[in-house]
From Swiss-Prot:
ATP binds at residues 235-241. The active site is at residues 85, 181, 183. It comes from Shewanella halifaxensis (strain HAW-EB4). The keyword Signal does not apply. GO terms for molecular function: ATP binding; GMP synthase activity. GO terms for cellular component: cytosol. Pathway: Purine metabolism; GMP biosynthesis; GMP from XMP (L-Gln route): step 1/1. Keywords: ATP-binding, Glutamine amidotransferase, GMP biosynthesis, Ligase, Nucleotide-binding, Purine biosynthesis. Residues 8-207 form the Glutamine amidotransferase type-1 domain. This is GMP synthase [glutamine-hydrolyzing]. It catalyses: XMP + L-glutamine + ATP + H2O = GMP + L-glutamate + AMP + diphosphate + 2 H(+). Residues 208-400 form the GMPS ATP-PPase domain. Homodimer.
């Protein structure tokens, strides 16, 4: 079996919204990489032993006092280094070049760079050719500051009209800097540049593939678990479903899946989960009906973070209780994925802020009696889905729209009550059904319904009704870090509204959320 971690790239994060995208692009190329905060120690880098290092972008100015710098060891480690945007600027400044603060002449958005000098990074890449026969590249810029003098040993590789050093290189040391963002799709040849860096310049083998990842995960699970038994909280979502299939392959009937019906699931979801994993795949599943327990625990609580923590705590309590029924259950498996780990870790410098606590990594008690098994903690969501397909899970389940770990607990605004959940389930099912019928479901990235704890006057026949309000939410996004509200057809929205008001007794008004992210988040809570 090939070692999927043998060749690897280290990405240092300076705070750019695009940093996770760099990691996903490197993984798509077939090379393992990890994303660390910029303030790592020499010892940590030596221990990781990367084949190459990428310095990512960031929002700060290299010219500002106390702005982040790459560890000096990065440039003495004897491996290729690629600086992107802020990463190029700090590389230049740290190696003896100069960076000047932008004064109203930054570049934001589409730009065309002209390649001046041959470089391993841009080998055989062009989108067009200039009048003088130089390759032109369509790229995406997002910078105010710029390099005004490159370090000794570097050459200017590319320029734009306002940026004389859009790319620089020291081919002897294999140090490269680009002022644009090769990781975004707007940079048309960006993936090829990253391929040149990872596969050719860093000489990494493309071992990071779904079948190899599965094989590696199964071997590691066997080594970690031994003859112990494992309990997994199976929700029917993508992450826990893929964990279930991996563990089933690794340890067979030593896996007990605990499916907790917390009363916060979608319509008929409990029945569907039991049918697929119990009847079809033959997993050992314990079905716990805990609706009242969750609702009682959340009674009177309206604050979103507190609700998330309560839901997480009650889940763990139930797992603890179920584990006591399995004499050898020493492990609790979770569907934690890599973005959860990144966002919850933050930086030692305190520059990362918690926007929402993650269901899988927040709220676990310190005295939890089981060890944690997290076979997906190295993987991005798109990788988890590809692995799920390889393991035989159905496409329509793996590519269903995201559903939050706390479920309807954060889609009912304020205090969660059974009545609200029941109404929301019915309204949401109508919305999703109509999206499928209109062939719109796969054209939006996420769609759902939110219950608003406000009443509104309505008229039904000759009678007046005073009932609840729901909001429809549909967004389009590539990475869920930014999103646009989906411009669904008016007649479609009208049809959904009419069906909900006529078929769901207790809802009198339907509204449509037209907020983007930012400033709003995709979920309301």
């Amino acid at each position: 079996m090939s070692n999927i971690h043998e060749h690897k790239i280290l990405i240092l994060d300076f705070g750019s919204q695009y940093t996770q995208l760099i990691a996903r692009r490197i993984r798509e190329i077939g090379v393992y990489c990890e994303l660390w905060a910029w303030d790592v120690s020499e010892e940590q880098i030596r221990e990781f032993a990367p084949n190459g290092i990428i310095l990512a972008g960031g929002p700060e100015s290299v010219t500002a006092e106390n702005s982040p710098r790459a560890p000096e060891y990065v440039f003495n480690a004897g491996v290729p280094v690629l600086g992107i945007c802020y990463g190029m600027q700090t590389m230049s400044e740290q190696l003896g070049g100069k960076v000047i603060q932008g004064v109203g002449e930054g570049e934001f958005g589409y730009a065309q760079v002209e390649v001046q000098t041959e470089s391993a990074l841009f080998k055989a890449i062009e989108d067009a050719v200039s009048e003088t026969g130089k390759p032109l590249l369509d790229v995406w810029m997002s910078h105010g500051d710029k390099v005004s003098a490159i370090p000794e040993g570097f050459v200017a590789v590319a320029k734009t009209e306002t940026c004389p050093f859009a790319a620089m290189a020291n081919e002897d040391k294999q140090f490269y800097g680009v002022q644009f963002h090769p990781e975004v799709t707007h940079t048309r040849q960006g993936k090829r540049m990253l391929e040149h860096f990872a596969l050719e310049i860093c000489a990494c083998a493309a071992n990071w593939k779904p079948a190899s990842i599965i094989e590696d995960a199964i071997e590691r699970l066997k080594a970690q678990i031994g003859d112990d038994e494992v309990i997994l909280g199976l929700s029917g979502g993508v992450d826990s479903s893929v964990v279930a299939m991996l563990l089933h392959r690794a340890i067979g009937d030593k896996l007990t899946c605990v499916f907790v019906d917390n009363g916060l699931l979608r319509l008929n979801e409990a029945e569907q989960v039991m049918e697929m994993f119990g009847d079809h795949f033959g997993l050992n599943i314990v079905h716990v009906d805990a609706e009242n327990r969750f609702l009682d625990a959340m009674a009177g609580e309206a604050e979103p973070e507190a609700k998330r923590k309560i839901i997480g705590r009650v889940f763990v309590e139930i797992f603890d209780e179920e584990s006591k029924k399995c004499v050898n259950a020493k492990w609790l498996a979770q569907g934690t994925i890599y973005p959860d780990v990144i966002e919850s870790a933050g930086s030692a410098t305190g520059k990362a802020h918690c926007i929402k606590s993650h269901h899988n990594v927040g709220g676990l008690p310190d005295d939890m009696e089981m060890g944690l098994v997290e076979p997906l903690r190295e993987l991005f969501k798109d990788e988890v889905r590809k692995i799920g397909l390889e393991l035989g899970l159905p496409y329509n389940m793996l590519y269903r729209h995201p559903f939050p770990g706390p479920g309807l607990g954060v889609r009912v605004l304020g205090e969660v009550k059974k009545e609200y959940c029941d109404l929301l389930r019915l309204a949401d099912a109508i919305f999703i059904e109509e999206l499928h019928k209109a062939d719109l479901y796969n054209k939006v990235s996420q769609a759902f319904t939110v219950f608003l704890p406000v009443r509104s006057v309505g008229v039904m026949g000759d009678g007046r009704k005073y009932d609840w309000v729901v909001s429809l939410r549909a967004v389009e996004t590539i990475d869920f870090m930014t999103a646009h509200w989906a411009h669904l057809p008016y007649d479609f929205l009208g049809r959904v509204s009419n069906r909900i008001i006529n078929e769901v007794n207790g809802i009198s008004r339907v509204v449509y959320d037209i907020s983007g992210k930012p400033p709003a988040t995709i979920e309301w809570e």
